[in-house]
UniProtKB/Swiss-Prot annotation:
Protein's UniProt name: PTS system glucose-specific EIICBA component
GO biological process: D-glucose transmembrane transport; phosphoenolpyruvate-dependent sugar phosphotransferase system
GO molecular function, one term: D-glucose transmembrane transporter activity
Gene that encodes it: ptsG
EC numbers for this chain: 2.7.1.199
Assigned keywords, A-Z: Cell membrane, Kinase, Membrane, Phosphotransferase system, Sugar transport, Transferase, Transmembrane, Transmembrane helix, Transport
Primary subcellular site in the record, as a coarse category: membrane
GO CC list: plasma membrane
Function: The phosphoenolpyruvate-dependent sugar phosphotransferase system (sugar PTS), a major carbohydrate active transport system, catalyzes the phosphorylation of incoming sugar substrates concomitantly with their translocation across the cell membrane. This system is involved in glucose transport.
UniProt cross-references to PANTHER family, sorted A to Z: CYTOCHROME C-TYPE SYNTHESIS PROTEIN AND PTS TRANSMEMBRANE COMPONENT, PTS SYSTEM GLUCOSE-SPECIFIC EIICB COMPONENT-RELATED
Key word Membrane present: yes
Residues annotated as transmembrane: 16-36, 73-93, 126-146, 170-190, 199-219, 273-293, 303-323, 328-348, 355-375, 383-403
UniProt keyword Transport, yes or no: yes
Amino acid sequence: MRKKLFGQLQRIGKALMLPVAILPAAGLLLAIGTAMQGESLQHYLPFIQNGGVQTVAKLMTGAGGIIFDNLPMIFALGVAIGLAGGDGVAAIAAFVGYIIMNKTMGDFLQVTPKNIGDPASGYASILGIPTLQTGVFGGIIIGALAAWCYNKFYNINLPSYLGFFAGKRFVPIMMATTSFILAFPMALIWPTIQSGLNAFSTGLLDSNTGVAVFLFGFIKRLLIPFGLHHIFHAPFWFEFGSWKNAAGEIIHGDQRIFIEQIREGAHLTAGKFMQGEFPVMMFGLPAAALAIYHTAKPENKKVVAGLMGSAALTSFLTGITEPLEFSFLFVAPLLFFIHAVLDGLSFLTLYLLDLHLGYTFSGGFIDYFLLGILPNKTQWWLVIPVGLVYAVIYYFVFRFLIVKLKYKTPGREDKQSQAATASATELPYAVLEAMGGKANIKHLDACITRLRVEVNDKSKVDVPGLKDLGASGVLEVGNNMQAIFGPKSDQIKHEMQQIMNGQVVENPTTMEDDKDETVVVAEDKSATSELSHIVHAPLTGEVTPLSEVPDQVFSEKMMGDGIAIKPSQGEVRAPFNGKVQMIFPTKHAIGLVSDSGLELLIHIGLDTVKLNGEGFTLHVEEGQEVKQGDLLINFDLDYIRNHAKSDITPIIVTQGNITNLDFKQGEHGNISFGDQLFEAK
């Protein structure tokens, strides 16, 4: 139960990042527009006092401000999409649910425009609807409910006479019903919840603000490895605390108050739960990266310089710290704990210095410049001496502990032991043993990319052993293990099943052939690494980076590098001259090898293995030679969209030695059959 809850919290935390991602763009418009209207910038740049420039500045301020004014709705849409695997139907359902809930609450409580005029009432006008103000929490609740409706009903079957409403079309219908029902308990209990939140936040800030900001920074940093920090900071940024703007509206949340004060040019009082990250992200962590570089072995310093240099620059400019933090988190947990303590102390230090800095994305230089230096509303320059002190502390603490405790930070690792080897015949036995043996297997399954095993006791699974056997990654979700063996996953599963049933695995790829093939493949790989391979688009549609595919195996490139296409037509065509290497039994995936030796996997949709071949028509067979543009597979696009998690189609280079992909038309935009997709080297 606890593991399941933890997994759900991780998903919610990740989903919150989608609506948060729009805030930097809104903040950029608002910050520049506000700065152009301020006396400070006009003093240095008199030409911006021109009437036309000021009109543009006001438009920019309004365009940025409207995003912050409608954050609850944006959170509803974003959380719904995030928890539903990226499907837009969930967003439509969330919008339907959001307006129905607010309209029903307003009518039930008899809220009128006159009621809204009283700030103490807790009422507000949302999208023109007089209703109860539930804030960002209300949006998150609706988003989660819409995602639940989607995941529950997206593939529902109805009688033939109601067939039009089956599948994904049923989701907004259910959402309309559930949000109408939800409105009544929300109308009755939310005022009490809101009063409790206000009392808690007021007491927290009034009792001992210094302790509060220290604990906030410390706990938020400790939660990063678990992906729960987005859940933790959301109430502080969007709900806790209150401030009345010039129009008499009550604004809640440290970040929202800060942005509103910047927009109005008011005296700054917010930023306590954001500003502590500037010294750490701009100075402390880059200094830690320098310490890691200086303690690396001489023969590894060139590689570490590239790794740490890019991570440090990312932290300084944008405030994205995970690439740097995860480089030492697991090998040196004490360093991460000290890092969390220093983060909390940074919040406390800036609070004691009476600074008021905020951001829309993170504590990097970009936000520091736009929302600190340009508005010039607080003593922003004090961050620099504090940051320099932090740089010295981080550098010497990290360097001393890395050397003293012999931490294996990047560049200090021992030479890797030789990976375990197993022939094709031995591999299923070895994988079964690594999974804890037959008695530990509760359920065995596979798809085109991974071996899916539900085990009785996760502690018996040898994760490093699975990686030594060729798994490019191992995912753990409760007692469910997913070992990424690529296209051979289904074969391994089939042979493991035979072993468990007491059958003999007969010559899956004969021993002699396997040895010969290994030599040939090794030679091919060394040769192909020097070649250039042109891959043309096998589908027509919209190009999407792998990082945006809502499946961890593809987004984290466990199968290999590549790109994805969201198809607009139900055809897959050969992307080059070559041969069909493998077709998955359920027809949803095909493996190809080009005449130049490039191995490519085309995986139509996500979780389409569950369709058992329905909606797919093959036009080729394994071993068949194909020419570029030959029709490989037809698929029913509407059926996949209605019955699968997503129609997005990853296109993966499965050779680990080919890592340089040049996307000729970029990783976004539309593409058609035959257009050059990328060049692989």
